[in-house]
Amino acid sequence: MAEQNELKPAVAPLWTRDFTIITLGSVVSMLGNAMSGFALSLLVLDYTDSPLLYAIYIATFTAPQIVAPIFSGAILDRFSRKRTIYTLDFISAGIYAAAALILSQGWFSFPVLAVGCFIIGTINSVYMVAYESFYPMLITEGNYSKAYSIASVLETLAAVMIPISTYLYNKVGIAPLLGINAACFLTAAIAETQIRAEEKYIETQRATAAEGESSARRLLRDIREGFGFLWSEKGLLAVACYFAFSSLAGGASQVITLPYFKSTFDNGEYVYMLVWGMMVVGRTVGGLVHYKVQLPTHRKYAIALTVYIVISVLEGTYLYMPVPVMMAMCLCNGLLGVTSYTIRISATQSYVPDEKKGRFNGAFNMLNTVGSLTGQLVAGALTVILPTRLVLTAFMTVTAVAAVIFVGGNRGAVSAIYNRQQ
């Protein structure tokens, strides 16, 4: 027995120095960003009282996420992702500190705010590609699912800051919240400079660089290679296509659900928070379960496909139910959603080589953004002529069909990615 124990490979610890730093840094910046972001939305509505200007405000933040990930992904496969992460956090700290100072003087200009949102949106787009490509490099072998279950819980807990943000905004105004966010970004940036992980992919990419090739030509070649890699990997392409449709339905849900609750129930926004709060509970519980319990490796593909279809059915039908049933369905949706997230991201990030992660994540994020924006626009137009619940059901039906076609229709290629020890 003792001899068998000696032969059994030791499981590497997840909570290494670098992983702890990146996780704590993410918590600090994520909570501060969630709080100030929602408060800024309230500020725009209070000052402009215009749905059109609010839509423009949202668009200026979202628009850079279509193009920026593609170019940043190619660049970040050749340069330090760690340096990019903490540099962008330092810049964000400066921007939010300046905004806090300006707004504390009572000065407000919507055009200036829109430009600032465009800059922040661009920074956020580049940051997300850098973070998503660097984070898996800090995870020890065999701990991908556990690490991403932690990430999903932290992202979910950021939603808790929304009611806190609302309360503080009404009590102290926007400037102190932006100041807090600046301090959060500064703290995260200082901590991230202490990460020691080596980025060996830089040397790998440098060795493949063509001598005498201009930076612009190399960038375009890297972008082509990124899409070529995605196109050549049948399983990754199927997953990316399905999640583009999932984002399409998610965009539709964003523009349908809150207006539906406000027009259907007295104090509908509070009913909305109650129902969707169960989604947060479900994702939190699900993330904690995934941290403790490992799914059977050989069944991850089957579980994922089932989850994709069931989520579409739940989201496509819950608005027809009484509020208590809605809450139960959203709880289930949260549990299943974190399962979907953990399986997909741990599988793909452990599968894609380090030197290609930036381009893959850039392409994946771009497809998701295009899907989300398309869903928002199309759903908004359809609700003018069709019942809102019917529109949401139609989008979710399309997503379920996409799961069957792309994920189910490419069983061998997708299962080869999902059913791996991570």
Question: Could you say what each language-model-derived stretch is?
Answer:
Residues 67-70, 78, 82-84, 88, ...:
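C-terminal transmembrane bundle of multi-pass solute transporters/carriers
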Residues 41-47, 100-105, 160-182, 263-264, ...:
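Transmembrane alpha-helix termini and helix-breaking/packing motifs in multi-pass membrane transporters
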